[in-house]
């Protein structure tokens, strides 16, 4: 259930603010996936690199991304500390992720500290934080 209808049903006080900026309801997995894929559009509605959209967070000090000479990357956002040896395309990749040689990630969201093992094929998926995705 979405937050506002839930609060209304409980009888909670609901107030409004006429916000003019970017907002997207990501209350379902499909909406969350779509919002992330929109970030890698050629001209995204919400451009993370525009100066007025700056988001300041506490970050860990980790090395930059590493892309092996044999890796293939197309239209992705890749977090710091990520190592790419395989192929990634049209995906949002968190920090500290390892994409092993022979692994292929397409149209997906991979959360922090996850390992995509050799030979794994990930397509249109959301992979949780700190897990291993294996080929079978």
Label each PLM-derived region with a short phrase.
Residues 1-136:
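Left-handed beta-helix
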């Amino acid at each position: 259930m979405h937050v506002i209808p839930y609060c209304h049903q409980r009888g909670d006080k609901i107030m409004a603010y006429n916000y003019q900026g970017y907002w997207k309801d990501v209350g379902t997995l499909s909406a969350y996936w779509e919002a992330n894929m929109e970030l890698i559009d050629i001209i995204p509605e919400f451009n993370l690199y525009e100066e007025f959209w700056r988001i300041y967070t506490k970050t860990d000090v980790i090395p930059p991304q590493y892309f092996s000479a044999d890796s293939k990357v197309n239209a992705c956002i890749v977090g710091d500390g990520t190592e790419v040896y395989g192929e990634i395309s049209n995906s949002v990749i968190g920090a500290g992720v390892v994409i092993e040689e022979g692994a292929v990630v397409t149209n997906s969201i991979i959360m922090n500290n996850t390992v995509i093992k050799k030979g794994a094929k990930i397509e249109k998926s959301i992979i949780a934080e700190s897990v291993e995705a294996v080929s079978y």
